[in-house]
A protein has these predicted regions:
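Glycine-enriched, solvent-exposed interface loops adjoining structured elements
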Residues: 1-226
């Protein structure tokens, strides 16, 4: 797990912007640039996380507000026993479930075809995608951004901060127009490269996984090659 904090990333962004002493960009602007870069990164390469939750009551609706940064649920096993000494295979994959949001809080609805419903103290094993976090940013306690992608976030944040500065300068009387153009060119170049790298990550994620996923079973008109 990375030990990088928001202060570390903020310092790196300021170095890239040649403003080590924060004479031009304040912390709020830099932090917002980091947020924007993380948000774009999270859409291109969300983190895959697995956890087990114990149900507080009976029912098909399961509150998932304890899962920080949740974006999508990608898999659910139920029934599941984390204390079992023998593996259950194939696992009890739930084929029908829906994630919806109630006043901004995620709720998982389990559409179990056999009529059964989860009971209190049952365990669910859940796979989900989440946005990356940086220690100290918006209350995050740990950094979940892979260390090898920190430089990518720094570049994106610098681009966002530069473009924010351009907006500020354009609205200031007596501003050196040439300086604004140069700064805007720098900001756009940083963001262009940042988004190109995100496209590469997105393409790489699409190529992962098994050749054939789960699908319809064979019927009497189908055949399988050996």
């Amino acid at each position: 797990m990375s030990t990088t904090t928001i202060a570390d990333l903020r310092s790196r962004v300021l170095v890239l912007l040649m403003d080590v002493g924060s004479a031009i960009w304040d912390s709020d602007t830099i932090d917002e640039g980091i947020r924007q870069a993380l948000a774009e990164y999270g859409k291109a390469r969300p983190l895959g996380i697995e956890t087990v939750i114990t149900l507080p009551g009976d029912g098909r609706e399961v509150a998932l507000d304890s899962l920080t940064g949740l974006q999508e649920v990608t898999g659910v096993w139920w029934p599941y026993d984390s204390s079992a000494t023998m593996e259950t295979w194939p696992p009890n994959k739930i084929k029908g479930y829906t994630l919806w949001w109630d006043d901004g809080q995620p709720v998982l609805f389990l559409n179990v075809l056999d009529g059964a419903q989860p009971q209190q103290d049952d365990e669910l094993r859940i796979w989900y995608s989440a946005a990356p976090e940086i220690t100290g940013l918006d209350g995050a306690a740990v950094t979940t951004l892979p260390a090898w992608h920190e430089s990518l976030i720094v570049a994106g944040a610098a681009g966002h901060a530069a473009m924010s500065r351009v907006v500020d300068l354009v609205e200031t009387a007596g501003t050196d127009t040439y300086a604004v153009v140069v700064l805007g060119t720098f900001g756009r170049a940083q963001l262009k490269q940042f988004r190109y790298e995100l496209d590469q990550l997105r393409a790489g994620e699409a190529r992962k996984g098994s050749s054939w996923g789960a699908g319809w079973g064979l019927d009497k008109w189908d055949s399988a090659r050996e």
